[in-house]
């Protein structure tokens, strides 16, 4: 009973950790890919600005500055979206960890209560049999369980 509960809880925690790591890795990979695409787009725009600047200096500079500003604004918006998504994911992870901790703690308390009840029953059986050493052993176990339960 105890091993099953602990194994089940351990399995849930491991599955959650794997899922969290996978999601985090995917999010980081997406962010890196996005940043690389933005850098590439920016470099292309920069190259275009240099080419056009040589042909029509004044007019092209004004147009390209506007394009660069738009690109920067789009980049900032995308970075804000990624940041927001990462904050949401972190919040979700924190909630899931709290749920696992709460469930695990509840399971452990149930196990301790069950063990305490079984120890009391064993003490009654030993007291009826008159075994002094067994009774002392069970009394010691009860004391241990009661101190860990508090």
Curated annotation (Swiss-Prot):
Effect of residue 63 to I: Decreases meiotic gene conversion at ade6, crossing-over between ade6 and arg1, and abolishes double-strand break (DSB) formation at a DSB hotspot
Primary residence: cytoplasm
Record's subcellular location: Cytoplasm; Nucleus; Chromosome
Modified residues (Phosphoserine): 11
GO biological process: chromosome segregation; meiotic DNA double-strand break formation involved in reciprocal meiotic recombination; reciprocal meiotic recombination
Gene null: resulting phenotype: Abnormal linear element formation. Abnormal sporulation.
Stated consequence of mutating residue 36 to D: Decreases meiotic gene conversion at ade6, and crossing-over between ade6 and arg1
Gene Ontology CC, one term: chromatin
The organism's place on the tree of life at top rank: Eukaryota
UniProt keyword list: Chromosome, Chromosome partition, Cytoplasm, Meiosis, Nucleus, Phosphoprotein
Known function: During meiotic DNA recombination, binds to and may help activate DNA double-strand break (DSB) hotspot sites.
Name this polypeptide is given: Linear element protein rec25
Organism encoding this protein: Schizosaccharomyces pombe (strain 972 / ATCC 24843) (Fission yeast)
Gene: rec25
């Amino acid at each position: 009973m105890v091993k099953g509960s602990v194994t089940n809880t351990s399995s849930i925690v491991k599955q959650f950790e794997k899922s969290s790591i996978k999601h985090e890795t995917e999010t980081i990979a997406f962010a890196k890919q996005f940043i690389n695409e933005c850098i590439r787009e920016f470099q292309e725009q920069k190259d275009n600005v240099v080419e056009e600047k040589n042909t029509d200096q004044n007019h092209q500079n004004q147009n390209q500055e506007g394009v660069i500003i738009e690109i920067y604004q789009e980049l900032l918006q995308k970075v804000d979206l990624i940041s927001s998504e990462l904050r949401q994911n972190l919040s979700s992870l924190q909630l899931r960890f709290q749920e696992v901790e709460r469930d695990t703690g509840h399971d452990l308390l149930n196990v301790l209560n069950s063990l305490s009840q079984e120890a009391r029953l064993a003490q009654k059986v030993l007291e009826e049999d008159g075994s002094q050493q067994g009774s002392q052993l069970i009394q010691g176990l009860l004391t241990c369980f009661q101190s860990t339960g508090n």
